[in-house]
A protein has these predicted regions:
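N-terminal capping/small domains of soluble enzymes
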Residues: 1-69, 80, 262, 325-338, ...
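Structured core elements
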Residues: 96, 116-118, 159, 193, ...
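Charged (often Lys/Glu-rich) extended helix/loop segments that serve as interaction or gating elements
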Residues: 230-384
Length: 384
């Protein structure tokens, strides 16, 4: 198969789904897929074997849940628009408002949806502000001091999101803050949604701690249904982005392998977070971006070769580095970025008209199926 291509591996996806299904059973809670991290709808038949619902944050995501997943969505949006609201209601089973003003404006049009409010516990351990939903001045959620003692009679639940690829020890501390600030309203509720960012499929995740936390929570609040809505956890380490070396250039002694993919177009979190992805067969070498220090070429003494990896766009900063390989790279050689299924295909763009990677599935029987191939028409029709 030609590169570039995202390859999702069915065996790895089913592994995650089975694990999440077992966690849901042991914690007596519902776990639903957040489309903001993963929305490859051609895989939904597999998901339906393990979960029964999804979460949406826009009309398009809500329609995807209803029309392609086959079940109404748990929907939350920072702000609903008047002209979209009725269609969102049609596609939703649960509807969470970000503010009391949005609730007042729309709740009478919400039909049979189970209504909720997003709360802000004013606590999050997410260090990168770009991904911290509880940072000072955040636009997300209602703080405890703004809630009335008696909630509106049609509010059935609270929604709280304050994690990002977090462990259960972080959730334990977050839960303490949530209960301290908001538990006095729990008797008025039917459900609570603890949001996403619970990375239960990571190898070092302490599942037993989560089970204990939920056992205690259910004992304290036996009437509350508990919901988790991770995204990354479902697609965590389920497949790579495969690229090829198109050219190798050198400037001031720095070698850059230019690839047929782009960090800014196809791996945006690498630049936004930022973080260095794992490259198969290579070792990332720490070197501060923009540093005046010379690149660590002394590491090449062991026979390795050091390269920056550059994207094929005209953005000057569309590169990352350095990686050490055990051989000199050649034009046409494949460079494989591991764990590139979550927060990639949902965030890619066609900046510069760069060819979008195809999407394929490696089935459990070893066959490789092309799910989507992108063409010039996809780029052109965005401007139509």
């Amino acid at each position: 198969m030609e590169t570039p291509v995202y390859i999702i591996e069915e065996t790895l996806l089913r592994r995650n789904l089975a694990l999440i299904s077992e966690v849901a059973r042991r914690t007596d809670s519902e776990w639903i897929l957040a489309f903001k991290a993963f929305a490859l709808w051609k895989t939904f038949p597999i998901f339906r074997e393990y979960i029964s619902s999804t979460t949406a944050s826009s009309l398009s995501e809500a329609r995807l849940a209803f029309e392609e997943f086959g079940a109404k969505a748990h929907t939350y949006s920072p702000a609903y628009k008047d002209e979209e609201f009725d269609d969102i209601v049609r596609c939703s089973s649960h509807l969470t408002f970000n503010s009391l003003s949005q609730y007042e404006r729309f709740h009478e049009r919400a039909g049979e949806c189970s209504l909720g409010l997003r709360i802000n516990p004013e606590y999050s351990e997410v260090e990168t502000l770009l991904y911290n939903p509880c940072a000072p001045g955040t636009r997300f959620g209602v703080t405890a001091d703004k809630l009335p003692e008696q909630l509106p009679s049609d509010i059935r639940g609270f929604h709280c999101h304050c994690h990002c690829e977090s462990g259960s020890e972080v959730f334990e501390r977050s839960l303490q803050h949530i209960e301290e600030k908001f538990s006095k309203w729990f008797p008025q509720l039917e459900w609570i949604n603890f949001g996403g960012g619970h990375l239960v499929t990571r190898k070092d995740y302490d599942t037993e701690r989560l089970v204990r936390l939920m056992q205690g929570f259910h004992e304290r609040y036996p009437h509350l249904k508990v919901i988790f809505e991770p995204g990354s956890a479902f697609a965590w380490q389920t497949g790579p982005l495969v690229s090829s070396v198109v050219d190798i250039v050198e400037n001031k002694g720095i070698r850059t392998a230019i690839l047929d993919v782009s960090f800014t177009c196809h791996m945006p979190d690498c630049l936004e977070m930022p973080y260095f992805p794992e490259v198969r067969g290579a070792q990332h070498v720490e070197h501060e971006v923009g540093s005046s220090q010379e690149p660590p070429f002394h590491l090449e003494g062991a026979g390795g070769r050091l390269y920056r990896l550059g994207g094929n766009s005209c953005l000057s900063g569309d590169w990352m580095g350095y990686w050490q390989f055990d051989h000199e790279l050649q034009v046409g050689e494949q460079i494989i970025f591991e764990d590139m299924i979550h927060y990639t295909t949902v965030k890619t763009n066609t900046f510069n008209g760069i060819t979008h990677p195809s999407i394929a599935m490696l089935h459990s029987d070893g066959s490789l199926e092309l799910l989507r191939e992108f063409t010039y028409e996809d780029y052109r029709d965005r401007m139509d």
